[in-house]
């Protein structure tokens, strides 16, 4: 790793000399020696005769960047970029180049993490507040969250939200027959394990008999039909039910929004706001509610608060709803959503403004009217926005073939009906080709007055000031400059794996051959993408030791959910549907418990020892107590305590002996690749985080991809899809067959360029850096957990509880002070309150790791001054952190520390820093005074 001749050498931040330096501090002779000391012998893979790890030895040899890009180009060229007029929730759109260059292709945006440290995340928090304002303005509701995974999962969350809000014994929901097919399928998946009964009906005739807690309708419907649902909403409310409407945001620039007709919830996707179809994703879904249901919302919610100087500031609000706190009682298991795509959609709306969006909508509608006018009596619905449904008895296949011959894909509803969807990219030429396919001549457009909206929208300056490219470019730069992303600094967040997202990995995702593919396009159009999917599935099988992989889950949370559903269906297929107990260690991430609850399982907590390991005696006791009903054990490996538990094989065997399945959470797979395979040491199923281990960027909180990998006996129960007969027959968990398919080339490129040796080296280097940090910082902050040989895995936990007890300085103080030193804080208070979990990853250099250590040592010296009484506990640079440039320029400075100590604690030559945009934020104030849309400009005066 000295001459940087391979991609792996450029991905890994340490050269051979730096590795030797770290190993000397750790006290081991080599990387292999470290692996032997850290990883239990019973699971550590022995290298094959070729020198590669088992499984990985079957991967293709590492390719150069040029070779990998050439192979990706060949895969892209195997696709056909047809004009998509399929619709069904996915539409072509024009991504403004200024947004493509300054957001999607900008590491300042795509390498950031979820804004848990809001003082150094104000830029993307503002962008997300813009997104929430966009959604609330267009839907006519008061509160929207900061994105959902896609429209189908947003619908499922809307259903469970209504069930929680209804607070009654009724477990029936009615779904209109004109809801998108894929949405209905995801709803059915979510409903079954929760015991919710779905009644499907044509709701134009009103509600069917019986009691319901909720009603779900679509606007416009899958057939294109626009229905006035106001009478249905009133009827539902009269019968004690809530109403959720899946609404097209572009259509809502013209038609009355759900909130104005009385609906309680709106859900959908923002895909057509500048986000490519991408063979299914990623796209930002949305969910909006009335303010009284705000605490029922799932996922992230950005709110306005104030900092310690009284300045308005943004933060994540109402976090007590979320899985990392409420575990199996959470509103949802969602963590990562689609922040990067939400930012893109928000800026698309800002760039076009209300007038521009309305003009696009009118143009789309005009093209639909032109087609409808020519179809005449063949037209099925007389009110539509963008999608026209035509009756063509026995001719559907002929019409599709004629359009396809001229480069346009239409949608076959059945043998007698074809639908045509217009979008932002539709032209008069496309309309002419469509009419020719139907065999009709152009005629006068069928003018339909659908403009029932009277309320204004997007009047805030965020949507009126940035119409020129110059102003938008500068706005995006100004926002990015407020944040710490990987382009500025190491982000040592434990359990998050903030590694390099290489430019060569990212390059192909903007190619139209990948981006402009409809997820339901003919298979002949997507041969290259399908080969890429097959490659990736086979490589992940080799890496994990499992037998099959589904790439459909579009987040780690959904991978967990899919894996647990597969386990449940497996037990049911064996005549044991009663197996519903899920054992989860007390140290587990809250998502595990939330996912188990969504899968209809009952969580039983297994105790852990003081060293973090699972208490085997308690595990055996719980297994024995629940043997007849035991469904699964969920266990993270390496553990959430940052160590390799040496009893993992025994733990798995105990569960298997009782008829249970073992779910190995793959969140920490970056410490296993090339060293041990969960499918070989006892796991039956794992989800993987491609946005952690395999280089898909975090995007400030999404997109993510959470494939689920299983042993052969669970493979038949992997997610299926109503429009993908090639998939297994399991239940779909995402709207698209292959989830967020357009970002899969990132992981494909990473594996292809790293090869077997590079992948193993990445794991070993990550472990080396973590152990080096543990050794350097242990005398200042005790390392809470180590394995049997005194080693950690790829992350370490620094214990500040004793420091807090002695000095009053908290983990929050240290996290905020790190911003003054130019660093993003590690993970706070997980898995143990009062601690920091540090994960350096393999991509960081020795210089960067040393700088982080020096910052932490400098902070410890400051803490000692507080402990010695030199600085009072309520007025010191830690409690005052972070310090903005504005506060340092104040005429009055009455603190016992200097301005220089506040701003540059290790001197101006230490490292470049991102100045925090605000002082420490008052979280409680923001939750008490909930504001989740753009505040007026006067608030900042």
Swiss-Prot record:
Keyword terms, alphabetized: Oxidoreductase, Pyridoxal phosphate
GO molecular function annotation: glycine binding; glycine dehydrogenase (decarboxylating) activity; pyridoxal phosphate binding
Uppermost EC category: oxidoreductase
A GO biological process held by the record: glycine decarboxylation via glycine cleavage system
Domain of life the protein comes from: Bacteria
InterPro entries: GcvP, GDC-P_C, GDC-P_N, GDC_P, PyrdxlP-dep_Trfase, PyrdxlP-dep_Trfase_major, PyrdxlP-dep_Trfase_small
A Pfam family this chain is assigned to: GDC-P
GO CC terms, sorted: cytosol; glycine cleavage complex; peptidoglycan-based cell wall; plasma membrane
Family: Belongs to the GcvP family.
Subunit structure: The glycine cleavage system is composed of four proteins: P, T, L and H.
Protein name (record): Probable glycine dehydrogenase (decarboxylating)
